[in-house]
């Protein structure tokens, strides 16, 4: 059983976030913090202060879910909150972030297992299949651009050591076996 701890009511907020219709969400995006040692609280403080996304800071943490290196999972935002995690994709996507710097040998396998279960649960709740779980680097316009017919990578997020095809296959197996139903809110 995987427990998702809802901390949405206690995370810092810099201002009232925009709301959206959750039925418009068609993509689950996997991210990494890209900072060594950062946890959900460090990430939330960074996002709600002036940062690389906004000189004013984001209204909230940029991710709806967060998975620590030890596999502890958090719900940070409800699906109706429009988070600032992938530019033009913000209206139609929901973010899941790994506490992982995005380099080295890759995140711990247990952390990836928990992230896959969280992504499967979110996908089922939104009526999506595993093909709609993408890494930030896979999103055109934010993860990569096409210039003069060439694919130009802009982001490595959630880390190049994460095989997104294998991750999607894992999410798909969880959905087929309905194992995502063992992911519960606490």
What are these regions (language model features)?
Residues 1-25, 78, 92, 98-186:
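Basic/polar, cationic surfaces and motifs that engage anionic cell-wall
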Residues 2-77:
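Short, conserved "active-site rim" segments that organize catalytic pockets and cofactor/ligand binding
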Residues 48, 54-58, 72-110:
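Peptidoglycan-targeting cell-wall enzymes and recognition modules
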